[in-house]
Every structure is written in structure tokens, then in C-alpha cells.
């Protein structure tokens, strides 16, 4: 019904994409490239951004990109909207088929723009170069390590230092991965940060 619609004056960029919109990996590889393309490759002025329920860490990163919190439209609270113009972009790299196959074909420009946008924002702190990524605080149960005591012995033997990336600010995560020489851990979204590692 018309009463369900919320009206916005101006142009809205649609960045909603279901549950993956709040996933750390998909945020950097799906959503950030769309914002970059609109801001840097067009003259379109975006007034609002239609997004999946924004998390605190996302709001901070949006701010780095020049997107203010009051410019974000929460798609969970506003399922139907009207605007003068609504823009939706194709996925920047996924075409069709299995995700695992498509991610292997990730365009280099997607990685490079993330490095260009965020490497300069790193916050230096004293950290070790050989690191182990601990997923024990993850809200997801997959890729968890069950024999942690045995793994801890191995970690000590290999002179690795344990880090929980989600306990660090985004800026410190950039620095941690940028200075790392060895990174070990179970598969998880934190490995997205390898885009900030030094080449080689």
C-alpha cells in the first residue's frame, strides 16, 4: 500500500544485497567497488545509500569514504522506498555459476581500489609479523578449531602471535596485515585483509 513507502528527495544508490551485505568480504569486494565507480567514474551526485542494516564497523568505513550515517537508508526498516532516482549497478565481478569459480577471476582493479582507498588510513601500533588468526570469537560456527590446546603448542613452536582481528579497529587491522610476513588461520572473513599485505 502507498503508506508503506517512504519518500526520499534526490538520488538513491541501491547497495542492498541480502545477508551478504553485512559480510566483511562482500562489503569490500562487492559494495566498496560500486561506491567507487559512482563517485570516481560518473558525475552522478548520490544523496542516499540504500544498504543492509549497517553495522558499527561499516558506518566507520562509510565515513572514510565520505558517506555520512544520515545518508544511509536501512533496508530492513525501509523495505519500500520512492526517490527521484534510484540507481542499481551490476555486480562488479560475479557473473554466473559457482561463487568459488568466480572469485578466482577477481578483477585486479577491485583489489587496487581498496588498497588505494584504505592503506593510507592504517593506524600504526606495535605488532608481530608472524601472526595466527583466532576465529574463536566468531558469531559463525564454521571453520572453528576444536583441538585448540594442541594448536596452541604448534603456534608457540612456530613463533606465531595470536590475534583476533575483530578486536582491533579497522585502521589497526590494515597495519597488522600490511606489516605481516606470515599469516596462518582457518578460513574466514578476516582473510579479506590480505588485500592490505605488502606484495610478495
Predicted regions and their residues:
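The feature primarily captures lumenal catalytic ectodomains
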Residues: 1-200
Amino acid at each position: 500500500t502507498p503508506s508503506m513507502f517512504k519518500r526520499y528527495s534526490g538520488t538513491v544508490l541501491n547497495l542492498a544485497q541480502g545477508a551478504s551485505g553485512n559480510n566483511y568480504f562482500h562489503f569490500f569486494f562487492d559494495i566498496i567497488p560500486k561506491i567507487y565507480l559512482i563517485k570516481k567514474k560518473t558525475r552522478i551526485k548520490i544523496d542516499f545509500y540504500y544498504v543492509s542494516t549497517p553495522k558499527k564497523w561499516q558506518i566507520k568505513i562509510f565515513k572514510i569514504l565520505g558517506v555520512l550515517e544520515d545518508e544511509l537508508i536501512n533496508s530492513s526498516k525501509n523495505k519500500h522506498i520512492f526517490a527521484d532516482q534510484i540507481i542499481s549497478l551490476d555486480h562488479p565481478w560475479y557473473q554466473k555459476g559457482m561463487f568459488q569459480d568466480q572469485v578466482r577471476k577477481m578483477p585486479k582493479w577491485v583489489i587496487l581500489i581498496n588498497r588505494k582507498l584504505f592503506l593510507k588510513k592504517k593506524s600504526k601500533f606495535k605488532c608481530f609479523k608472524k601472526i595466527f588468526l583466532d576465529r574463536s570469537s566468531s558469531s559463525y560456527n564454521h571453520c572453528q578449531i576444536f583441538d585448540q590446546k594442541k594448536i596452541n603448542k604448534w603456534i608457540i613452536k612456530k613463533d606465531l602471535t595470536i590475534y583476533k582481528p575483530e578486536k582491533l579497529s579497522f585502521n589497526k587491522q590494515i597495519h597488522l596485515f600490511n606489516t605481516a610476513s606470515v599469516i596462518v588461520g582457518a578460513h574466514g572473513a578476516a582473510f579479506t585483509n590480505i588485500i592490505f599485505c605488502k606484495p610478495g
